[in-house]
A protein has these predicted regions:
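Sec/Tat signal peptide C-region and signal peptidase I cleavage site
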Residues: 14-18
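The canonical Cys-X-X-Cys-His
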Residues: 134-144
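Extracytoplasmic c-type cytochrome modules immediately beyond a signal peptide or single-pass transmembrane anchor
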Residues: 19-133, 148-185
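Bacterial N-terminal signal peptides
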Residues: 4-13
Length: 185
């Protein structure tokens, strides 16, 4: 090699960039547990106060603010799914591909809990982690939603696709994004 010093410098730059990206990905992934907990506690509290109908109202009115509150340091936090209830949460092309990959892997027997995907897409660091359908979710998202609740869901979400799930199935994913270079180093 004619330019060993240049090669070494380039290698260090690439290594530093990879470490910086890994740090950003870890930073984003670290936001998910608190967001998940806050969302779950809000929905469970609404269920205790007024049953599934109150939980549907809480999801519709409070969930967007909870997502916004958990976005920090340039991160935007949200949820998406292949079968959405709220059309505002529909996946973009990359999210759809990741969700389909999560679904294939789960179908092949890989546990959802161990999955995560992170990439740089169009100048943004993107992170997704799957959401498994939990037992409490089945009242509104399961295979046997009570008729009165189903009517309420149709009133609030005329294009609802988010039913028919079984416990443990892929319900959707947490999705996070932030600019790769936002001027913070």
């Amino acid at each position: 090699m004619r330019y060993p010093l240049l090669a070494a410098c380039l290698g260090l730059c690439v290594s530093a960039q990879a470490e910086s990206l890994d740090a950003r990905i870890a930073e984003g992934a670290a936001l998910i547990p608190a967001f998940q907990k806050h969302l779950l506690e809000t929905v469970q509290g609404a269920m205790r106060q007024g049953g599934p109908a109150q939980a549907v109202a809480a999801c519709q009115t409070l969930a967007p603010g909870i997502a916004e509150a958990h976005g920090q340091d340039g991160w935007r936090v949200g949820r998406t799914a292949l079968k959405v209830r709220n059309p505002a949460n529909a996946p973009d092309t990359w999210e759809r591909q990741v969700l389909e990959d999560f679904a294939r892997r789960a179908q092949a027997g890989e546990p959802l809990a161990g999955m995560q995907r992170a990439e740089v897409v169009d100048g943004e660091v993107r992170v997704m982690k799957p959401i498994a359908t939990g037992a409490p979710c089945l009242a509104c998202h399961g295979t046997q939603v009570e008729p009165q609740l189903a009517r309420l869901i149709r009133e609030r979400y005329p294009d609802d696709q988010a039913t028919g799930f079984r416990e443990g199935e892929l319900r959707g994913a947490f999705t996070l994004r932030r600019p790769v270079d936002d001027g913070e180093g």
